[in-house]
From Swiss-Prot:
GO terms for cellular component: cytoplasm. It catalyses: 7-aminomethyl-7-carbaguanosine(34) in tRNA + S-adenosyl-L-methionine = epoxyqueuosine(34) in tRNA + adenine + L-methionine + 2 H(+). GO terms for biological process: queuosine biosynthetic process; tRNA wobble guanine modification. Monomer. InterPro entries: QueA (IPR003699), QueA_dom1 (IPR042118), QueA_dom2 (IPR042119), QueA_sf (IPR036100). The lineage of its organism: Bacteria, Pseudomonadati, Pseudomonadota, Alphaproteobacteria, Maricaulales. It comes from the Bacteria. Its EC number is 2.4.99.17. Keywords: Cytoplasm, Queuosine biosynthesis, S-adenosyl-L-methionine, Transferase. This is S-adenosylmethionine:tRNA ribosyltransferase-isomerase.
Length: 353
């Protein structure tokens, strides 16, 4: 399909710079399986779901992956000190990360970047688009602790361009379920949930389980090809525990609905599906790319936020509910002044029949 088929005009005023307060006060557009949509709120979830429905949450935790450092003056080859912005996006091993850096052109293989007094990293690989491999002078838990001190919360670029990171983001950009550190962006659909909403869902008889996908910075990269067949999806690490697989498989076997919360939870369970209605426990890197015509082995409904024009995430929701339906639903959301993107409002999408 042509990438331009997934385009739409989004006024900048629709981009949310702060979350709703409280979190579950956000609005929610419900899109039924027949394409009919209705204006609701996140707090309406217990009324829209059924006893026995299984919600699947991503329990990844965002790390403070935005770092500012200095490349010292070179003793050989010239060049004074250079300020460097580093956004970690994928862990390679205990001491190495891949990162997007600026200005990448001012860095060479073997250059050292200093982040404060003690944390340092050496450039050991360079790729296109400012993507470099960094090896730090710490490893494992010690490196995690050093990054936590030196780094800032990595807000999406469309928010960071409009305002700086502040202390509110440290709490606002983590979900209620955040447990396993490793993401450089939040699984944003999970940001809408509060203890009160979870209690109401439990009282309704809605069940829950958790999976993990560590969100990479590639989630913000634009699609540069003209045709979806030519796009190479970024890969991210994900895992489904035996407990989660058992819960999902039991729900499917009993005819109960499985509802991932967020595209990351959906991509995880679909990546580890071994057949219709069956997901296997395990871990893997996934580059699954879902577009109209793709099959869904597990997902019956999806709760997600509103996404960028021509993004892989808008392609995913179009695959689930239909491109024509999503174009109409998004046009309605824009006209009705829904709030878009990471800190914005939500959609509850039923798989198209």
């Amino acid at each position: 399909m042509r990438v331009s088929d997934f385009d739409f005009h989004l006024p900048e005023a629709r981009i949310a710079l702060r979350p709703a307060r409280p979190r579950d006060a956000a609005r929610m557009l419900h899109v039924a399986s027949n394409g009919v949509f209705a204006d609701r709120g996140v707090r309406d979830l217990p009324d829209l779901l059924q006893p026995g429905d299984l919600m699947v949450f991503n329990d990844t935790r965002v790390i403070p992956a935005a770092l500012k450092g200095i490349r010292p003056a070179r003793a050989v080859g010239g060049g004074g000190p250079v300020e460097v912005e580093v956004n970690l996006h994928k862990r390679i091993d205990a001491s190495a990360w891949r990162a997007f850096v600026r200005p990448a052109k001012r860095l060479r293989m073997g250059d050292e970047i200093a982040f404060g007094e003690t944390l340092k990293a050496e450039v050991t690989g360079k790729s296109e688009g400012g993507d470099v491999r960094l090896v730090f002078n710490a490893a494992g838990a010690a490196l995690d602790a050093a990054i936590a001190v030196a780094g800032e919360m990595p807000l999406p670029p469309y928010i960071a361009r409009k305002r700086g990171v502040d202390e509110k983001d440290e709490a606002d950009y983590q979900t209620l379920f955040a447990t396993h550190e490793g993401s450089v962006a939040a699984p944003t659909a999970g940001l809408h949930f509060t203890p009160e909403l979870m209690a109401a869902l439990e009282a309704r008889g809605v069940e829950q389980t958790r999976v993990t996908l560590h969100v990479g910075a590639g989630t913000f990269l634009p699609v540069k090809s003209d045709d979806t067949d030519d796009h190479q999806m970024h890969s991210e690490w994900c895992t489904v525990s035996a407990e989660a697989a058992d819960a999902i498989n039991a729900a499917k076997a009993e005819g109960r609905r499985v509802i991932p919360v967020g595209t990351t939870a959906l991509r995880t369970i679909e990546s580890l599906a071994s057949g219709p209605g069956i997901v296997r426990a395990g871990s893997r890197d996934t580059d699954i790319f879902l577009t109209p015509g793709s099959d869904f082995a597990i997902t019956d409904m999806l709760m997600t936020n509103f996404h960028l024009p021509k993004s892989t995430l808008f392609m995913l929701v179009s695959a689930l509910s239909g491109l024509d339906v999503m174009q109409r639903a998004y046009a309605h959301a824009i006209a009705a002044e829904y709030r878009f993107y990471s800190y914005g409002d939500a959609c509850l999408l039923e798989r198209r029949t």
